[in-house]
Amino acid sequence: MRTAIVYYSLSGNTAYVAEKIAERIKTLGEVDIIRIEPKKAYPDKGAKKFFWGGKSAVMGETPALQPYEFNIEKYDRIIFGTPVWASTFVPPLRTFINENPDVKDKKIAVFTCYSGGGADKATDKMKKHLGIEKFEAELILIDPKDKEKEENDAKIEAFCSALI
């Protein structure tokens, strides 16, 4: 089975988890990691980070993305990785989904990273945006780069086991 892990990461938490998941599921088949980035970067520090990221998320914006390589035909499964901004998934992933509407026809899993809550709402909004009822697997982590390594590793392992 060929899997694409498609994610956006501002502070590094989502990137950290994407690498951990890729490491664990590579025994299932080929895994490609696709980091998406908006053409205009979001501020990554201070009040501007929360204001511009939150505004963009709440308004449902779809920012233009940096070029990325993705061919839906190559993949059986898509794993989305997103920080939670204002109780929703990040705008760059909204753009990616809009640009690749056939992803909904693949097996889909999701992982979220957050500091302030709203992860369940974020995954529900992503399901609605994709037009699907459920994910193959879901993983929610609080600040995974900085929190208890063993606890997060166990959650990542359970998520990956659900994909088998």
Where are these regions (language model features)?
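N-terminal beta1-alpha1-beta2 submodule of the flavodoxin-like/Rossmannoid cofactor-binding fold
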Residues: 1-78, 87-89, 94, 99, ...
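Short, conserved loop/helix-junction motifs that constitute active-site signature segments
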Residues: 72-73, 98-105, 130-133
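Glycine-rich, N-terminal phosphate-binding loop of Rossmann-like dinucleotide-binding domains
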Residues: 82-83
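Short, well-ordered alpha-helical microsegments
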Residues: 89, 119-120
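Short beta-alpha junction loops
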Residues: 112-117
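Short, aromatic/basic amphipathic alpha-helical patches
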Residues: 121-131
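Glycine-rich phosphate/pyrophosphate-binding loop and the adjoining helix
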Residues: 134-164
